[in-house]
Amino acid sequence: DVLVPRPDTEMLVEVALELRPQGVLDVGTGCGAIALAVADELPETRVVAIDISMDALRVAQANTDRLGLGDRVDVVSRGVNSLAGAEPDGRPFDLLLANLPYVSEAEWDGLAPEIREYEPREALVAGPTGLEAIEALLAKVAELERRPGAVALEVGAGQADAVVGLVSAAGFGEVEKRRDLS
């Protein structure tokens, strides 16, 4: 019921390790892999991990408890439309990390059978273009009174240029693209 993290997602953790933020918001946390890796590697960092899937949140909380990171990771039921107020201790986040759905509806049928048959569709498919979840997130981030200092997103093949435009339109000045492990 929860997406299995891929090696490419490690890029988001690497960004956090480079920036060494005090507060991180992990949007679409799934099983909590990103949030927990950041909290484990950066003991001074406070992480809020949010998702709309109750199944994912149960897995993320169980993983948080199993790793003993509950003092630094808050697992919260919250969606993109309710980012305001998610800050730990009322402080703005230094970094927002997100591995949101980015597969288009048309691409779904072409995915490998082991993905289509065993991964939750809602964790992968964003809508007709594949950019809908990222667009919604960036629109809400742009509305925040206190925006995070940096945003790192995992996006699909061929989406980077479009997402760079969306990030720029959301008011983030410096935008950097990185290739993943594949």
Segments (PLM) and residue ranges:
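Glycine/small-residue-rich loop that forms an oxyanion/phosphate-binding "nest" at active or ligand-binding sites
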Residues: 4
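Mobile active-site "lid"/loop adjacent to the S-adenosyl-L-methionine
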Residues: 100-133
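Acidic-residue sensor for enzyme active/binding pockets
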Residues: 10, 41, 114, 119, ...
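Class I S-adenosylmethionine-dependent transferase superfamily signal
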Residues: 38, 115, 137-141
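Acidic catalytic motifs of isoprenoid enzymes
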Residues: 1
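Helix-to-beta-strand junctions that scaffold the AdoMet/dcAdoMet cofactor pocket
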Residues: 69, 119, 144-147
